[in-house]
Amino acid sequence: MSCYDLCPPTSCISRPQPIADSGNEPCVRQCPDSTTVIQPPPVVVTFPGPILSSFPQDSVVGSSGAPIFGGSSLGYGGSSLGYGGLYGYGGSSLGYGGLYGYGGSSLGYGGLYGYGGSSLGYGGLYGYGRSYGSGYCSPYSYRYNRYRRGSCGPC
């Protein structure tokens, strides 16, 4: 690589020697251009793979026939946290009997139309027990009917 000066040449003119040496002229040196090849480093690009999902579903197939002894409406077991069926012989909705059956319904111990307590009580609303209380009769039951047989006490 060769360089050349861009500084002004010294002239052959005689001049007096200065007392202080100072100069205010820039001197620039320019060299020829150089070239180089820069290759980028290899780049690794990762494409995410597909997401495979599965949603297995289980099915239980029953048969028609006699009711089972478990929790369901029309059964003999507990339904909705209870111990009987909606139309059966056990509790429904936190109770111990069926809504139309022989046990408690809705926090009670009998059926709404049956033989036990309904709705916080111990008997049925239209049956042989009591509704909305802790007694043993209801306004429409066989033990308390002020329209037919008198009263067995306030329900």
UniProtKB/Swiss-Prot annotation:
The avian keratins (F-ker, S-ker, C-ker and B-ker) are a complex mixture of very similar polypeptides. It holds the Pfam family Keratin. InterPro entries: Keratin (IPR003461). Sequence repeats lie at residues 70-76, 77-89, 90-102, 103-115, 116-128. This is Scale keratin. GO terms for cellular component: intermediate filament. Keywords: Keratin, Repeat. It comes from Gallus gallus (Chicken). Belongs to the avian keratin family. It comes from the Eukaryota. GO terms for molecular function: structural constituent of cytoskeleton. The lineage of its organism: Eukaryota, Metazoa, Chordata, Craniata, Vertebrata.
